[in-house]
Amino acid sequence: MTVTLNRGSITSLMSSSQAVSTLQPVASELKTQLENKLKSESAEKTREVLWQQYYASNPPDHAVLEVLAMPVREALLARFGQHQGSVVPAIDLPELRSVLQQFDSFGKRWEAILLQVLEGIKPNESQVGLPYLSELINKELMILLPSNSIVDSLLHNSHQIDMDT
């Protein structure tokens, strides 16, 4: 078999090899993004399975909750661990919620995680930001606990007729 190359085919071969070399970094970046997406999806699925296991156990399995709370605790300590002074709710609570939103989107889960994190961070003098983080979590729990109770009450008691009216 004989292959003949002319000037036009050589130019097109060169341009296609240049295109391949140009597309290689883009392809590797897309591959990395896809791998990260798959890892995050598998992490989300793992968290969901752990939450199902936690809710299915009677009494609730605190070891599972500790596994669920560990990455949240690390993220909160990384974000708020060095803060000092008093909590500014208008600024700090939305930041706390954005950190929590990265892990779960349900208020009832936030409540369980925050209570576990609060139990795990006993304020002491060796770490500077722990009293700040404890105060911040307490302020968020003062909002979460009543609102979760209201939602829970509406979900469980909405079928009952109110006889007082």
Curated annotation (Swiss-Prot):
One of its GO terms (cellular component) is extracellular region. It holds the Pfam family T3SS_needle_reg. It comes from the Bacteria. InterPro entries: T3SS_YopR, YopR_core. This is Type 3 secretion system regulator YopR. Transmembrane segments: none annotated. Belongs to the YopR family. Keywords: Plasmid, Secreted, Virulence. SUPFAM superfamilies: Type III secretion system domain. Coiled coil: none annotated. The gene is yscH. Induction: At 37 degrees Celsius in the absence of calcium. Belongs to an operon involved in the translocation of Yop proteins across the bacterial membranes or in the specific control of this function. May be involved in the regulation of the assembly of the type III secretion system (T3SS), also called injectisome, which is used to inject bacterial effector proteins into eukaryotic host cells. May control the secretion and/or polymerization of YscF/SctF, the principal component of the needle filament, thereby impacting the assembly of the T3SS. Involved in pathogenesis. GO terms for biological process: protein secretion by the type III secretion system. It is found in: Secreted.
